[in-house]
A protein has these predicted regions:
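Short, well-structured N-terminal submotif of metal-dependent ribonuclease cores
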Residues: 1-45, 50-66, 133
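Short, surface-exposed, polar/charged, turn-prone segments marking secondary-structure boundaries
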Residues: 31-33, 64-67, 74, 114-115, ...
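Helix-adjacent hinge/juxtasegments
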Residues: 52-86
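C-terminal binding/interaction regions
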Residues: 146
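Hydrophobic core segments within long, regular secondary-structure runs in both alpha-
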Residues: 25, 67-70, 74, 93, ...
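Active-site neighborhoods of divalent-metal-dependent phosphate/nucleic-acid chemistry enzymes
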Residues: 79-137
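Generic detector of contiguous secondary-structure segments
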Residues: 27-37, 76-86, 129
Length: 146
């Protein structure tokens, strides 16, 4: 089974100080043996999100921790612990836009939230891991467990 994780889930998984770290680790252990995948969206968003967190006015992430998280992520991709899969850009953007049209009028969803859902669907993910309940609800409607 393919497991697709939202970027914020990966950040919790990779950061010991994160409030959801233990929950993320336990979820990953339950899914051991399945294929955890990443795509271009993760490769773009995760480093940018971590760097942005160093500039927060409240509880900024220290730069050395941010660099460690990015390095751990890169090593997991390079070492094939996280399997890199390509997503068709045109199709994933169209799907994300459709999801926004369907769900974005009822609740707030960011571009990346919708794009991750579209990518997971295009990669035939059976599980979508996220801490965002709104995103998880849509994943469930799309047939993915979470």
């Amino acid at each position: 089974m393919i497991v697709y994780c939202d970027t914020s889930w990966f950040l919790s998984y990779l950061t010991e100080d994160d409030e959801n770290h233990v929950i993320a680790r336990e979820a990953a252990e339950k899914l051991a043996g399945h294929d955890f995948v990443v795509c271009e969206i993760h490769l773009l968003e995760l480093p940018a999100a971590v760097r942005a967190a160093t500039h927060r006015t409240q509880d900024p992430v220290p730069e050395h921790i941010a660099r460690r998280v990015i390095n751990r992520f890169d090593r997991a991709v390079t070492g094939k612990i996280l399997l890199r899969k390509e997503v068709d850009m045109k199709d994933s953007v169209a799907m994300a836009r459709s999801l926004g049209e369907t769900h974005g009028w009822k609740e707030r969803h960011t571009t990346f939230d919708l794009w991750h859902l579209a990518a997971a669907w295009s990669l035939s993910a059976g599980t979508f891991l996220t801490f965002d309940q709104r995103q998880g609800k849509i994943a469930g409607l799309m047939g993915m467990s979470n």
